[in-house]
């Protein structure tokens, strides 16, 4: 809805590869306007959706009347778990994975659970990795962390960070 270019490129790739018309259909738009219309339309036989649990529940509800097939991938953010015998690069890889796609990926880990005996070492590695990550505009090539998609998303992230701090999480950088 806010960043449809990658989906449009994927659709073009499928067409160029010879995918038959109608096998894959891309409809861009917001969930309330386009999503509700699409998921409740009688000519739509199946809906595949990746996104929030709230939106997935609405899709399931809309699709139930017609017994549509529904595939949902919802709220998949999880934790990195670091045990004492973990590879010494595990923390660094975990932090970098968290930053993939500016952290706006459904499989980006949102926290790190660390065994007590290696906690201080893990915090130091996580902090150094985060601090050494370059930031720049999204259109610039190279390895760096770009901006989030909107001010609304930025504000949501700030609320989530504060919620973690309020629940005694440690913000390391």
Question: Language-model segments: which ranges?
Answer:
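Conserved small-residue-rich beta-alpha loop and adjacent elements
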Residues: 1-22, 45
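ALDH superfamily catalytic-core signature
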Residues: 40-41, 46, 52-173
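Glycine-/small-residue-rich active-site loops that bind phosphorylated ligands and cofactors
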Residues: 2-3, 26, 114
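A structured beta-alpha segment of the ubiquitous adenosine-cofactor-binding alpha/beta core
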Residues: 10, 25-48
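Conserved beta-strand segments of alpha/beta enzyme cores
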Residues: 23-25, 170
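Beta-loop-alpha module in the N-terminal Rossmann-like domain of NAD(P)-dependent dehydrogenases
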Residues: 3, 30-37, 51-58
